[in-house]
């Protein structure tokens, strides 16, 4: 392992020491709590949407969340280990067969729905 990988590993450990990042994948509906600074006030803003892409690159890992806001599609890219992210909560698991769901950009309404992933009996028994 080279020096850069070692430093990145230590930085990830430092950034995740006070928060837990759940396992999520494209197709999942997540709620991302983001710290927003307005003037001298700091508040937490919830951003809920479908994960359409996830990029696993160590410290540079990121994911894109898409939601429909007042009839208009809005996408936001988040850095996974950013200190601005207060927390991530998985609301619903989606059953998709693609790693990148960019095709949802052209779809709206019923055609943009994602089937919910059902938990198998073996997985329930393991819990």
From Swiss-Prot:
GO biological process, one term: translation
A GO cellular component entry from the record: cytosolic large ribosomal subunit
Domain of life (superkingdom): Bacteria
Family: Belongs to the bacterial ribosomal protein bL19 family.
Species of provenance: Cupriavidus pinatubonensis (strain JMP 134 / LMG 1197)
Protein's recorded name: Large ribosomal subunit protein bL19
Disulfide bond is among the record's keywords: no
Originating gene: rplS
Function, as annotated: This protein is located at the 30S-50S ribosomal subunit interface and may play a role in the structure and function of the aminoacyl-tRNA binding site.
Pfam family, any one: Ribosomal_L19
GO molecular function, one term: structural constituent of ribosome
PANTHER family: LARGE RIBOSOMAL SUBUNIT PROTEIN BL19M, RIBOSOMAL PROTEIN L19
Alphabetic keyword roster: Ribonucleoprotein, Ribosomal protein
